[in-house]
């Protein structure tokens, strides 16, 4: 069940789900479609480089099966090795959004990755592309390493979110840099979406308990034994973590503290 009373706001849009789901690596298109439905996500990200921009192509027939009146497309620039390449992908992403009936959609998940082995984002290329796209009116969601200073620079440029990685893309290693993620979250005045590396619902919960505003994942669902079930589990994990964060964790204590009252108890002799 979505929490409509605690919306995620990105740019001028509000979303009831704080889970974003990718569309790659699924065994079948049916798995992708059913997982998206089961996750109850509002935002679906699509790698533009890996798709033709013609919505009538058979290669992206699964996109036509999704309800774009309920879902919001987040085109991503995955595969871009330079800022210039990412900028071109962003404009192609907007064209695809228009073909899906979302003419007002200028969202882009900005990825500039020049390293083919470790797939770590290029901070210089990301800054360069972000500055250009923000000036062109795009709602930019940059994928970055867990670098607190870079996050602040991107916020200053006008990015709508920052998306620090939990661990390398597709690794399933979970949250490897909790300290830096916490610093980014504490200092940001824009939403922080933890992106990449999450492999289990408990890790999605942990990200939300830290205070992240949302989680984006793909491989953890797509490559699980039961993608639909994992999508539902991730949905619950994100909601649980968010509610726990809002409720506030109890203070840790050095010594044990009884949970039952110890005063005003009659002694029985």
Curated annotation (Swiss-Prot):
Reactions accelerated catalytically: [ThiS sulfur-carrier protein]-C-terminal-Gly-aminoethanethioate + 2-iminoacetate + 1-deoxy-D-xylulose 5-phosphate = [ThiS sulfur-carrier protein]-C-terminal Gly-Gly + 2-[(2R,5Z)-2-carboxy-4-methylthiazol-5(2H)-ylidene]ethyl phosphate + 2 H2O + H(+)
Active site: 109
GO MF term list: thiazole synthase activity
One Gene Ontology biological process: thiamine diphosphate biosynthetic process
Enzyme class: transferase
Keywords (A to Z) from UniProt: Chloroplast, Plastid, Schiff base, Thiamine biosynthesis, Transferase
InterPro entries in the cross-refs: Aldolase_TIM, Thiazole_synthase_ThiG, ThiG
Location of the protein in the cell: Plastid, Chloroplast
Gene Ontology cellular component list: 2-iminoacetate synthase complex; chloroplast
Statement: the UniProt record of this protein carries the keyword Zinc: no
Pfam families listed in its UniProt record: ThiG
Domain of life: Eukaryota
E.C. numbers: 2.8.1.10
Ligand binding (1-deoxy-D-xylulose 5-phosphate): 170, 196-197, 218-219
Pathway: Cofactor biosynthesis; thiamine diphosphate biosynthesis
Main localisation: plastid
Function: Catalyzes the rearrangement of 1-deoxy-D-xylulose 5-phosphate (DXP) to produce the thiazole phosphate moiety of thiamine. Sulfur is provided by the thiocarboxylate moiety of the carrier protein ThiS. In vitro, sulfur can be provided by H(2)S.
Similarity remark: Belongs to the ThiG family.
Assembly behavior: Homotetramer. Forms heterodimers with either ThiH or ThiS.
Name of this chain's protein: Thiazole synthase
Organism: Thalassiosira pseudonana
Name of encoding gene: thiG
């Amino acid at each position: 069940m979505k929490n409509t009373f605690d919306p995620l706001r990105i740019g001028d849009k509000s979303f009831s789900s704080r889970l974003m789901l990718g569309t790659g690596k699924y065994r079948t298109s049916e798995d992708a479609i059913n997982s998206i439905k089961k996750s109850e996500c509002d935002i679906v990200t699509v790698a533009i480089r890996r798709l033709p921009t013609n919505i009538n192509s058979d290669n992206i027939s699964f996109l036509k099966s999704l309800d774009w009146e309920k879902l919001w497309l987040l085109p991503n620039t995955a595969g871009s090795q330079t800022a210039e390449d990412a900028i071109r992908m962003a404009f192609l992403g907007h064209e695809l959004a228009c073909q899906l009936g979302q003419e007002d959609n200028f969202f882009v998940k900005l990825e500039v990755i020049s390293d083919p082995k470790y797939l770590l984002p290029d901070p210089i290329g990301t800054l360069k592309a972000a500055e250009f796209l923000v000036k062109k009116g795009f709602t930019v969601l940059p994928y970055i390493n867990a670098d607190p200073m870079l996050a602040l620079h991107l916020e200053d440029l006008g990015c709508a979110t920052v998306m620090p990685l939990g661990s390398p893309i597709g690794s399933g290693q979970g949250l490897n840099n909790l300290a830096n993620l916490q610093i980014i979250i504490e200092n940001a005045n824009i939403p922080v979406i933890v992106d990449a590396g999450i492999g289990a619902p408990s890790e999605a919960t942990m990200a939300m308990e830290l205070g992240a505003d949302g989680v984006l994942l793909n491989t953890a669902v797509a490559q699980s034994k039961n993608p639909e079930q994992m999508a539902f589990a991730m949905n619950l994990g994100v909601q649980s973590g968010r509610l726990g964060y809002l409720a506030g964790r109890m203070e840790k204590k050095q010594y044990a503290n009884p949970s039952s009252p110890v005063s005003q108890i009659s002694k029985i002799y």
